[in-house]
């Protein structure tokens, strides 16, 4: 209803101003600004829905403010471009419509009415309401009854007898198991669900609606609310350090805790969370690549579900035979939005819906088959009688290709339990939420029936039953939950440990690189993860007087304030204000200590603008002074006009990437010398090794041969035509995720370049 009202007010404002208000620059600007805000808010809502399927909420802040945690990023580039182009077109059209009768005399009454209607359209819009609620949730003091409902369980289980297998199905919500809505979509896993304890009404609450948040909620009994934005949990050294979570209790009770997934463990801070709470054995894409049968069989996120669950089964066998009490947690990935992935071993590779193939449904049908096969192996084993199997979704599905069909149903998270010691077959329709999962498991294992805000659904009463407005209540508790982090509110001294790549201050530790916004009563860490904007772009969003501490590789800040360090890959610390003074310090000791030094200076807006403009220069446009092209830093030498076919800088150099261009092309500002030596320090990838690699300058071509290790080769060129472009053509670029950013499409690698130098020859 509010959507229709807000749009009606918007349309009325446009029509009244365009046909009745007449000409007045101030009223035109004011009305266009407010109407433009309406457009921006609704496009933001649309974009947020596109990424997460949940509007503008904490998941958007966590996932989109500084990272794209739930996205295979390459698949969102075109929609992103479309949104920008659409926004530009709408603004242009809006301005043109409002100025239709600009030659008519100004009418104050109609202008005021149009502006009031525009303001009303903004106030009535769902986007404005959601953002307002988010802002309020950030500034509340908390709810006095939090302490009455937040309960810490005993740190041990008195007499543990059962092993635990806990399977998180990525986005595998219970809605998919509705056979009337989606016939024969989940037959194998659905049959297993019907054999166990099936909890049919597990709702999703704020702060539990993305992977790491769902894991925290299910293991600690609290939503993931933090004193920082974005993906900062990937940079902290501990995760809710004061809380008792399921993993802590299991470890204290003699369990060895294992976690296996196909994606990188560092993503979204899962490794930090698990290590902070009792898990000593973690396996992700990096750990598995040396043990899986086919390390090249991967999707955009990591290893396919069939590979991961095979490794989980091997681990289950090994641990069961050892006689050691254990828990084995695993997380699938093939059902990740927007489309999902199909494991090659599946029989169910295709699912049609609405008369056409649907990739997301196909991925669900395939993944549930793999999960069911894993469970059936456990059930057929002699160790099943000592095992509890839990299957749950980490969160509801985000905006995938099945999302519009899911939204037509009553959506709930998946949570069911199969007990080997005491088979029980029952569907329990009790109202509950993800925070109750850990408490229910703890109860089954013989521990307490409460965990944080979670309650056992077998012997306790869920917060979802106690509070009819549980979503609002959860947001009211947000400040109380944030305080559980015990996060410092000031930063005066800090220490950098180069061996660990960590910064420490006020008792907290963070991974480097890191940007910090420091105010009187708050320290806000802004990390650089796989999907966050580079720290310099985040710094460019700071206000002129915001105090900052920026710890990064020297070359990244050198172009602004320390040109002598433009080629240094050491750590440097910059601090100050963008509109005031800044200092850059070179970290020259293994353990380096310093203090914050923010001077209260007069703000220079010209300096601020210059700093912001420089910070926003994209990597390929950065230029530095050097006599060679150094590939492990961003940019290129001043002599280079432009380049293409080259991937991002890494610690050693850069790969050629045929996704960006079939050949490496470096165009110089001026013609290359008549006679010169080309000194290339590089290596080859895969089948490009020991193959002739053409290197061209103008009409002359030389051959380069590289191995898999870095070597230096000198080629001799004559350049009678004054050519200004160097071209290198890898013979067989290889599609691979080697060294790739999690969630990105594979790169096509050919040669790895460390340094290229042009040396003029005499004569």
Curated annotation (Swiss-Prot):
Localisation: Cell inner membrane
Catalytic activity field: a phosphatidylglycerol + a membrane-derived-oligosaccharide D-glucose = a 1,2-diacyl-sn-glycerol + a membrane-derived-oligosaccharide 6-(glycerophospho)-D-glucose
E.C. designation(s): 2.7.8.20
One Gene Ontology cellular component annotation held by this UniProt entry: plasma membrane
Tagged with keyword Cell membrane: yes
A Pfam family recorded for this sequence: Sulfatase
GO terms under biological process: glucan biosynthetic process
Membrane topology: Multi-pass membrane protein
Keyword Membrane: yes
GO molecular function terms noted in the UniProt entry: phosphatidylglycerol-membrane-oligosaccharide glycerophosphotransferase activity
Role, per record: Transfers a phosphoglycerol residue from phosphatidylglycerol to the membrane-bound nascent glucan backbones.
PANTHER family in alphabetical order: LIPOTEICHOIC ACID SYNTHASE, PHOSPHOGLYCEROL TRANSFERASE I
HAMAP family according to UniProt: MdoB_OpgB
Family: Belongs to the OpgB family.
Name of the protein: Phosphoglycerol transferase I
Lineage of the species this protein comes from: Bacteria, Pseudomonadati, Pseudomonadota, Gammaproteobacteria, Enterobacterales
Gene: mdoB
């Amino acid at each position: 209803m509010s959507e229709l009202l807000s749009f009606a007010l918007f349309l009325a404002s446009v029509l009244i101003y365009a046909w009745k208000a007449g000409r007045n620059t101030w009223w035109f600007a004011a009305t266009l600004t407010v109407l433009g805000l309406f457009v921006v808010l609704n496009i933001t809502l649309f974009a947020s829905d596109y990424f997460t399927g949940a509007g503008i909420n904490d998941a958007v802040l966590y996932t989109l403010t500084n990272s794209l945690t739930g996205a295979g990023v390459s698949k969102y580039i075109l929609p992103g471009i479309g949104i920008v182009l659409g926004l530009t077109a709408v603004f242009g059209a809006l301005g043109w419509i409002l100025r239709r009768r600009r030659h008519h005399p100004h009418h104050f009454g109609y202008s005021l009415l149009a502006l009031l209607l525009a303001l009303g359209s903004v106030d009535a819009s769902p986007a404005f309401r959601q953002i307002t609620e988010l802002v309020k949730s950030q500034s509340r003091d908390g709810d006095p009854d939090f302490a009455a409902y937040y309960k810490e369980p005993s740190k041990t289980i008195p007499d543990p007898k059962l092993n635990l297998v806990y399977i998180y199905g990525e986005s595998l919500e219970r809605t998919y198991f509705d056979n009337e809505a989606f016939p024969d979509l989940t037959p194998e896993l659905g049959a297993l669900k019907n054999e166990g304890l099936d909890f049919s009404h597990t709702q999703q609450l704020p702060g539990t609606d993305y992977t790491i948040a769902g894991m925290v909620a299910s293991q600690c009994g609290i939503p993931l609310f933090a004193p920082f934005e974005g993906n900062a949990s990937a940079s902290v050294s501990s995760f809710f350090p004061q809380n008792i979570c399921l993993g802590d209790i299991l470890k204290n009770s003699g369990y060895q805790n294992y976690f296996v997934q196909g994606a990188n463990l560092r993503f979204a801070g899962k490794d930090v969370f698990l290590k902070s709470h009792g898990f000593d054995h973690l396996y992700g894409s990096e750990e598995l690549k040396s043990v899986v049968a086919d390390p090249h069989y991967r999707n955009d996120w990591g290893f396919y579900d069939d590979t991961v669950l095979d490794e989980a089964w091997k681990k289950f066998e090994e641990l069961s035979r050892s006689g050691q009490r254990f828990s084995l947690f695993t997380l699938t990935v093939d059902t990740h939005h927007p489309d999902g992935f199909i494991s090659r071993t599946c029989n169910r590779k295709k699912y049609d819906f609405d008369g056409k193939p649907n990739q997301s449904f196909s991925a669900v049908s395939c993944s549930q088959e793999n999960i069911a096969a894993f469970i059936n192996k456990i059930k057929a084993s002699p160790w099943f009688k000592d095992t509890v199997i839990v299957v749950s979704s980490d969160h509801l599905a985000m905006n995938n290709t099945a999302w519009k069909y899911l939204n037509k149903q009553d959506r709930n998270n998946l949570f069911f339990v199969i007990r080997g010691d005491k088979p029980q077959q029952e569907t329990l329709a009790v109202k509950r939420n993800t925070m109750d999962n850990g408490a229910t498991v703890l109860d089954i294992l013989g521990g307490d029936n409460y965990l944080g805000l979670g309650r056992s659904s077998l012997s306790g009463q869920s917060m979802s039953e106690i509070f009819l407005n549980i979503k609002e209540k959860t947001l009211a508790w947000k400040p109380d939950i944030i305080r559980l982090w015990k996060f410092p509110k000031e930063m005066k001294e800090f220490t950098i440990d180069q061996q660990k790549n960590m910064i420490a201050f006020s008792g907290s530790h963070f991974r480097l690189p890191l940007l910090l916004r420091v105010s009187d009563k708050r320290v806000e860490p802004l990390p650089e993860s796989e999907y966050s904007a580079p720290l310099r772009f985040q710094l460019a969003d700071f206000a002129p007087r915001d105090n900052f501490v920026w710890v990064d590789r020297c070359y990244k800040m050198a172009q602004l304030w320390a040109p002598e360090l433009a080629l240094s890959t050491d750590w440097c610390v910059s601090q100050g204000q963008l509109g005031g003074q800044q200092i850059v310090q070179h970290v020259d000791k293994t353990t380096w200590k310093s203090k914050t030094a923010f001077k209260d200076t007069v703000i220079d807006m010209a300096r601020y603008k210059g700093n912001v403009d420089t910070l926003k220069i994209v990597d390929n446009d950065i230029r530095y002074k050097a006599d060679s092209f150094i590939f492990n830093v961003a940019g290129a030498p001043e002599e280079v006009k432009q380049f293409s076919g080259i991937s991002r800088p890494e610690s050693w150099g850069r790969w050629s990437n045929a996704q960006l261009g079939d050949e490496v092309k470096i165009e110089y500002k001026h013609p290359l010398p008549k006679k010169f030596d080309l000194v290339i320090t590089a290596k080859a990838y895969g089948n490009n090794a020991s193959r002739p690699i053409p290197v061209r300058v103008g009409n002359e071509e030389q051959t380069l041969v590289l191995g898999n290790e870095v070597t230096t080769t000198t080629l001799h060129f004559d350049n009678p035509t004054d050519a200004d472009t160097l071209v290198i053509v890898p013979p067989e670029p290889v599609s691979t995720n080697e060294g790739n950013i999690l969630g990105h499409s594979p790169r096509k690698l050919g040669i790895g370049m460390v340094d290229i130098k042009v040396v003029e020859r005499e004569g």
